[in-house]
Amino acid sequence: MNWDYNLGSVVATFLTSIGIQMIFAYFLSLPLSTIKSALVTSFGLTLLLKSDSTLVFSLSAALAIAQKFIFHKFRFHLWNPANFGIMVGILLTQNAWISPAQWGTETLLVFIIGTFGLAVLSNIKRLDTALVFLVTLLSLEYIRTVLYLEWNIEVYLHKISQGSIWLFALFMITDPMTTPNNKWVRRFWSGGVAIGTFYLANFHFINGAAQYILFLSTPLVPLLNWAFKGKTFNWINTTPMIKKHAISSMSIVLMLLLLSQEATAFCGFYVAKADATLFNQKSEVILVRDGNRTVITMSNDYKGEMKDFAIVVPVPVVLQDGDIKVVSRHIFQTLDGYSSPRLVEYYDQNPCYSDDYLNYSLSNAIPQVAESVMMNDNVLTEKEYGVTVEATYEVGEYSIAILSAKESEGLKAYLIQEGYKIPATAESVLAPYIKSNMKFFVAKVNLDRQKSSGFDYLHPIQIRFEHEKFMLPIRLGMANSTGEQDMIVYAFTKKGRVECTNYRTVKIPTDRNIPLYAREMFGEFYKNLFQRAYSREGKNAVHLEYAWTVTPSWGGTKCDPCVGPPPIYNDFAEAGVWWAQWNSNENVFFTRLHVRYSNSKFPSDLQFQVTPNNEHFQARYILTHPAPGPFTCDEGQAYLESLRNRRKLEVDEMYALGGFMPNSKSDQYINEFVPYMNNKPSESKDRGSNEFEPFNYNEISPESFAVDMAYVNGEKDNSNESPFKKETPWDVPVFVGSMLAFVFFIQRFNKK
């Protein structure tokens, strides 16, 4: 799952919740066993809220628990505690968010959540609440997605299998203290929450829509309970079995989730006149987003005849002349070179010398890494076709039209009549965009303007518009692409990182020590590393390769090391970052995402959100040079032994990350300094024999070579010399288990 958690935040959430609960329980003379309610709240916050601040988790947990007791004497909760904590974190701190796709869409995940959720709900008599919510929401999504928009069933299945919505349905909306007591009213209320969730998610594109609707609707529950009588639920009067299921189910779900870690298209599709067969196997896109304003710059790697080029891109509004321009393709080279995966070098000091320790970083890592990794390589009128030409423009070397259509068959026929070769499968992909009231940006080359420009290549196209939807329509691009395709997204915001909301956004493995000889093959190494990471994540995740503050006036380090100069004002202007002006100090945050997608694994367009996450990240790999000799002192001999062990780990890392089997070259690398280890001082024999058998990988079969996947997952440090520390995957489960043991101890003590 590769869930990006922080142990400190998890600990703070649990301790704050339990601490506040115990304080109120003491002053209100409530049994200590009520702290299990705080434990459930902690699970909800940990599973659904994201923030890069431990303080936000503590504040959310404290207010979530405290608000329950404000209404204690009225014997009802005004808000679901976890929901209240989540909304407080988002609305008050501006440093928290919800990641709808963080739990993925795996069938096993849904099965786990469903199984344990039903165990809880069947005991607390709230199964109907979850079922009504799910049936209503899933039915509405089916009607809109499949029947109305005419997307294929894979798109629908992807939407409804998001783990976060199942967590919400089975563990949050079903809270018996914040749902109506009357069963029929409760069912209508649950259906209303589902309708509101559907509306906000599909028409206002709000991430975490269910959380917002629940926050607004639970204050109505006391009024509904007053108007429509029903049996009041009371946790204290429930059976021990119910309480046992409630806590154990949530804890098992959390721990299972934590332990489950383990060629490109344009935004549109290329179309060609005559019978030219065009495939676009890579693309780069610049995304700039602030509020509802979006700027998209699309690279152009087309290499065919100019007369055969054309592109179709869905856009949400009719673009005006000033909303379209061409830019220099140099901007993509600048952003790629600056944010690409990189090498960093460290140098050991000879411990036999008394000089101060020297450990410095060089910035001469391969600046063209990303390139080496990514490079592969009877006439009717439009009215009769149901097509409207909303606007036409001449921009740069392109003739551009903005089209709207009533149905896909007519649009396809119109484009064919205009001389475009449309993929056979394009019609089924065009229909959903038409039903969504999207327009179509169509561009082809004006040969006269292109010839007069003096350039023998096509410039990137930049468009800008205002709309609530923040997405890239990749489905249209797959209409004429084969196999897997790569897209690099360079995103700029004022606030923080950009992440995908309908596919998981995961960090590429980084800060890993690899052998010195990896320098000469770094491009191939990173290609293999990405392929293995992509496969490990189920081939349906978006990978983060770089995230950093690049505000021109900011004095902090913008990378470590830098493989090129950071973007300057002219670069920001070219990329469409309109607020990065000479006289402005507004923040600019740069996110680089790498997407490898295919028809089978990415059935939906990419949906994005801007988060307040300002944590810096870069894909970097560490080369550590040995100290120069001689190594005649005891410390020098100990250093040589540790050097050999470290190099063995580096070779293992090279295999685990990139799949490079150890060979004679790696043997030589590991054992390079073994001859010097035989010259130890005689007194060193007191510590054992100084005879050393060189390690030989050739004596081990590939089948028996153990690959420590913890290195790949970032769960374990690979060297004591590494300047970065990784957490193991057991820290949070162990802590959660400790909290459970503490709660059960309190319960037993309270009974006595």
Question: Where are these predicted regions, by residue range?
Answer:
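Short, hydrophobic transmembrane alpha-helix segments
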Residues: 1-7, 25-30
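Membrane-interface helix-loop-helix junctions at boundaries between adjacent transmembrane segments
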Residues: 30-105
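Juxtamembrane/start-of-transmembrane alpha-helix segments at the extracytoplasmic/lumenal side
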Residues: 104-105, 242, 718-736
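C-terminal transmembrane helix-loop-helix hairpin of multi-pass membrane proteins
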Residues: 141-248
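Accessory, solvent-exposed terminal regions and/or long lumenal/extracellular loops of proteins
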Residues: 268-278, 369, 422-724
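Surface-exposed, glycine/proline- and aromatic-rich loop segments on solvent-exposed faces
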Residues: 288-351, 411-432, 437
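A cross-kingdom signal targeting lumenal/periplasmic-facing segments of multi-pass membrane
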Residues: 319, 323-395, 585
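C-terminal membrane-anchoring or membrane-association module
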Residues: 740-752
